[in-house]
Amino acid sequence: MKPLQSRIKRADYGIDAPTVVRNFFLIGISGCIVGTILAKFGSGRLPNWLVSFYGACLGIGGCFVLQGLIMIWGSKVGKQRLRDKMIDSVSWRGDEQVLDVGCGHGLMLIGAAKRLTTGQALGIDIWQQEDQASNSSRATQENALREGVADRVELRDSDARQLPFLDESFDVVLSSFAIHNIYDTVGREKAIREIHRVLKPGGQLVLADIRHTSQYADILRSLGWNQVTRWLPNFLFITPTRVVRAAKPNTRS
């Protein structure tokens, strides 16, 4: 009989941008197949100029497959390492009220909940399948159970542009790879302004994204935040990922 720990399923934090990953593999494998066919069977049957493209097909196909593998590594390994760095950058007491904007499968949410004793971690999302494979509140709750923090986690269906919370409700706001999914500039600004509204004076914000982080930082500075930094980029998902780390001024706005 297997030990109890080995029988308990590990938390599954999903594959980010599953359609993109699928397309990388489809294009890559197709290119490799075409290149192989041209190399093995094309000589004498097809024009030489066409056969000469076999190397390009194999090279391009291999690059797309590699990008798909990097995306999977980013989802399964890289983003968990980044999560740990982001969580470690927060000064925790244990009694914080935490909000995770666009929590998905709960990677940031659960990481924060593990740092809490009497506090509570609340995650909001609209659960879009194109953002993460099998994205649902049920999957997130299951992950919280597997990680032993279900009693410190709460989930709600909500749009980042209109958060259903009172002003100055949270000590810490987290977000990872979510706000770029709001495609218009005005909508992203609304989301950042909502984060500003619900965060307490002196509260901490840590936000990771693959695009628009300079816009987020500029909006925060325009709202009077003077402790705003952007970390150096990393390449978890091909496109550079940057983290915005900021603290809301203690003066009430």
Where are the regions that the model predicts?
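N-terminal auxiliary segments of SAM/dcSAM-dependent transferases
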Residues: M1-I60, L69-I72
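A short acidic, Gly/Pro-enriched loop at the edge of an enzyme's catalytic core
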Residues: R93, R161-V173
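Conserved class I S-adenosyl-L-methionine
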Residues: G94-G104, L122
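Conserved SAM-binding loop of SAM-dependent methyltransferases across substrates and taxa
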Residues: H105-T117
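Helix-to-beta-strand junctions that scaffold the AdoMet/dcAdoMet cofactor pocket
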Residues: L116, I182-Y183, L199-P201
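A short glycine-rich, Lys/Arg-flanked "PGG" loop and its adjoining helix->strand segment in the class I
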Residues: R188-P201
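Conserved beta-strand signature within the Rossmann-like core of class I S-adenosyl-L-methionine
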Residues: G202-D209
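Core SAM-dependent methyltransferase catalytic element
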Residues: S222-G224, T229-S253
